[in-house]
Amino acid sequence: MLGFQQRLLLEEQEKFIDYRFNKALVRRLTLLEGAELEKFMQLFRPSYLFTKLSGDYEFRLYIKQSLYRYKRGLPPLVWEEENLLDQ
């Protein structure tokens, strides 16, 4: 069972991801709507670390590359968190 402080931290991290990876931005970049938009956002939700460390260009590029994979039925890429820290 997670401690109260850990739960609060996880909640804040999820809110930060929601703030950057929001429906308005994803809809604008992908032109997806409705259930398809929801499915895409669930499948390709970025990690907290990637969301925190990436700039706007990298973040939008991630969404576009994810759309390419989504439309071809490919799974999301697995990001190696250690590589993000080395940059």
For the regions a language model picked out, list residue spans one by one.
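Short beta-strand and adjacent turn/loop elements
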Residues: 1-87
